Amino acid sequence: MQKYDAIVVGAGNGGLSSACTLAKAGKRVLLIEQHNLPGGVASSFRRGRFEFETALHELAAIGKPGARGEVYELVNENYGVPITWIPVPDLFRAIHVQDDGTVLRDFTMPHGRQAFMDKMEEYAPGNREAVAKFYELFDECKAALNYIASANGSPDPKVLRKQYPNFLRVGSYSPMDVLTALKFTDDAKRIMGTYWSYMAVDMYRLSSIVYLMMVGDLVDGGAYIMEHTSHQLTTGMLEAFRRFGGESWFNVRAEEILFKDGRACGVRTTQGTVYADHIVWNGNPNMAFATMVPKGVIPERELKLANARKFSARMFVVYIGLNRTAEELGIKDYNIFISPGLDTADEYKRVGRMEKIRSTAALCYNVANPNIGPPGTCQMSFTMAYSKDVWGDVELRDYVNLKNQKAREILELYERATKTSIIPYIEEIAVATPWTFCRYAAVPEGGVYGYEAAGWDNCMARMMSLDRDFTIPGLKFTGAAGPRGDGFSESMLTGNIVGKMVLGEMAKEGK
């Protein structure tokens, strides 16, 4: 019988982080991955002479020398992964464009608190004090989350009330509530709401904590990408895991989580059965409950929670390799958010329907990393997040034509908004729909972001309930559906938190 201290199922960002934390602590850990590569969607793929980044737009919480962020401390310093981080030039450019090509607004925001504040004052005068208060709130919320993480999910309420009162106040409110309370003007709110499409939840329902952490970290510490795509990150974490003594099985599918007396005790795989007293599942709990866990051991609370939650962000992505350089095409921006500029609640409803694409996050990787592809070329991606399972209604016979139609719509939108011609120079193109992500990453409806961090299921509620939300003995969940929410940074930080929680339980068990 093969027995481990812990088994981690899934080598995505969260699973790799949990595995590294456990293995570095000296535990015997097995990492199981169904594919032949680590990373899940944190990877790359090749078409022709181009290697495309699969998912990452930019990473926060890296920071600069002397002021490193949480992700740099975790990945580079704690796990010892030698990644060279490349800074993204600006925070973002946003273009609000109508169907006829009329541009309503076009603004570019920089990194850095002071620079951001100055530029905000240029675009929306009278908001300097509001931005300053926003950052006071960000600092407090970040410190509060760090405290909760250090307490392994069991923070002292007295400490929170005394040291982080505003964190408790804003946790149940939306970003729009917070911006209104801080007295941002309407123009400033529109600028501050640009990142909503990253989360695929409108500014009236999104968790204010998630929003504060994302915007605050990106403005404060800047945004970064890896020199060699996110495949470099996940293979580096895998190497660290093995260096810590961990064992990994690839091309092996987990088929069932085993239980004894109501406690998880092992995993049945396509290569046999392995045992451990602690199982970490890097994936959506709904998938585990539906396919991997015997119904009799799932508490009623967990079933109700899973059914009450709402899947988030079903991704549609177009990847293109062009046979011209960014300079030749006149492309100067790394990251452009293109939309009609509607209220975010209206935008959210619109992306819940299968209609003409009017919004996208467009990236040109060569602007940040000129050496990412072959000489004389550049590569781009265009992402749209659907708020509902509209692709689930597509008939198989219509799928290819619809996919290609939507790809053309998103490319024409970019050309219309930026007045830049790219379609004639496309050498390679690949299109990923929610079906693609559902198949590859085994996520319901293609929702790679897990659950919407909104309303009652907000980030603060999840973090405050860490010690109560894992009710199945021996089984914990990590990744984008975890307590800190979605995204590369949050998945890795969640993985570390879950790993530490398992270590805490092992210590109590005398292991």
Residue positions per predicted region:
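A conserved FAD-binding loop/helix module that cradles the flavin
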Residues: 56, 480-502
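Mid-domain catalytic core of redox enzymes
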Residues: 255-374
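Rossmann-like flavin
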Residues: 100-206
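Active-site-proximal substrate-binding core of FAD-dependent oxidoreductases
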Residues: 259, 504-511
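N-terminal glycine-rich phosphate/pyrophosphate-binding loop and immediately adjacent elements
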Residues: 2-140
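Helical element adjacent to the flavin cofactor pocket in flavoenzyme catalytic cores
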Residues: 212-264, 269-270
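C-terminal segments that line or cap access tunnels to active or ligand-binding sites in enzymes
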Residues: 325-435
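A glycine-rich dinucleotide-binding beta-alpha-beta segment and adjacent secondary-structure elements
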Residues: 185, 189-199, 357-363, 420-484
